[in-house]
Amino acid sequence: MVPNVVRFIGAVIGISLIGSGALMAGIDVGGLVFAMSPLIAAVIVRVVGGDGLRGVGLNWTGRQGWYWLAIVMFPAAMSVSVGLGLLVDAVELGKDVSFASVGTATLAALVPRIVLAVGEEFGWRGYLTPLLHANRVPPLANHAIVGLTWTIWHVPFILASPTFTNQPLWLFAPLFTLGVMAMAFILGETRLRTRSVWPAVYAHAIGSALCYTLLGEGVFARIDSLWFSPRPEGIVMIIVTGVIAILVFRVPRPATPPPASDQLPQFLSIP
């Protein structure tokens, strides 16, 4: 495997262990260290490799449709999940919940969630995805590597957070893996198709802000979280994001390669 890929994966897992360990010891800043560890790892590897900001994807390029997908994808998927739950009486909203209250709370949560999304996406889609692409790793394998790394990266934090899930671990683990993999394929494709990291940042921030709002106190009087949770591991969410991932892959790829200015330096690529 390409040395910088190994360096990044080792660094991001190592920093996540440090942050989660601090969190388990009662040091709250450990949660922030964990959340920002993909960005920290990317900076470390970029400095060691002398890469600077090349290949991050800070430009706003590509077709607007990919940006719209990033904006509406998670609100639509969560609406389907919760809506189906309401339809079959597996979800009951709190008595004071309204569309306006959920929207206002989501907007209020958006700014901090954008910061956290930058912390993650500048590592996953801002470094690892384009690094694999520059080294001629096919898209399916690219997103699978990123998705598996993303899943494993969560493990220390999940173990440090006893209330992270109410599902038994044997059931939660495969569902969570499927949910994260579906997201990795979608967000990875937005990165490769637009050559920009921003669609992934937007999608991640919006999805996170809305999800945590919906899971806030009083929003649901009751919910069958196994099937209809708005989180990635909800079964309906897995189905919806899986369908989106399949549809995204059916979009024809452009025949022309990305411009040289968006590719990683030659010394990071296989000759």
Where are the language model's segments positioned?
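C-terminal membrane module of polytopic membrane proteins
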Residues: A205-P271
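Interfacial transmembrane-helix boundary/kink motif in multi-pass membrane proteins
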Residues: V2-G14, D51-G83, L93-A105, P130-H143, ...
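Membrane-helix interface linkers and caps
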Residues: I27-A70, V82-S98, L131, L192, ...
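Membrane-interface helix/loop boundary segments of multi-pass membrane proteins
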Residues: G119-T149, L192-S196
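Membrane-interface helix termini and inter-helical loops of multi-pass transporters
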Residues: G55, L87-V97, L159-P168, G218-W227
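Aromatic-anchored segments of alpha-helical transmembrane domains
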Residues: I13-G21, P75-G83, L148-F157, A205-G218
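Functionally important transmembrane alpha-helices
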Residues: L169-S229
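Residue-level signature of the transmembrane alpha-helical core
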Residues: I13, M36, I71, T106, ...
